[in-house]
């Protein structure tokens, strides 16, 4: 078993995938297993769930993320959001549901620098989606 410190040796080379194939269809939150550099993370370390939302005649995915204090500052939140957008197409962070008004805007500011991702700050929250879904 790899030690957590070994998984995060290179902050610039973090590969995020999600566990088994997930169907996100209902309004219920779905917990996604997060795999970092080939190691499935314990839910004590990272919890990532998605709730589908129907807004403006489109489906969006609202993430809820928890990262253990010792693992913060390594780019995990950003990389998890980016991987999710590449796999599922979009995320939203409504102001009403956001618990962290410091880190979440930082994630969206970094996502806005990705050439294939569009980030919009609309009344009510942040939206991020693949340019190909415009």
Model-derived features with residue positions:
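Conserved acetyl-CoA-binding loop-helix of GNAT-fold acetyltransferases
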Residues: 67, 73-86
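Acetyl-CoA-dependent GNAT
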Residues: 16-58
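Polar, enzyme-active/binding microenvironments
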Residues: 43, 85-90
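Conserved active-site alpha-helix within GNAT-family acetyltransferase domains
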Residues: 92-126
């Amino acid at each position: 078993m790899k030690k957590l410190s070994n998984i995060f040796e290179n902050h610039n080379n973090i590969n995020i995938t999600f566990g088994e194939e997930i169907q996100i269809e209902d309004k219920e939150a779905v917990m996604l297993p997060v795999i970092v550099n080939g190691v499935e993370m314990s839910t004590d370390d990272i919890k990532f769930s998605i709730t589908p939302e129907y807004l403006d005649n489109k489906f969006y995915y609202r993430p809820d993320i928890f990262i253990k204090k010792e693992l913060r500052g390594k780019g995990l939140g950003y990389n998890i959001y980016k991987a999710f957008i590449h796999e599922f197409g979009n995320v939203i962070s409504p102001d009403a549901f956001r618990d962290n008004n410091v880190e979440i805007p930082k994630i969206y500011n970094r996502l806005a620098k990705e050439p294939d991702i569009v980030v919009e700050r609309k009344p009510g929250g942040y939206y991020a989606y693949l340019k190909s879904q415009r």
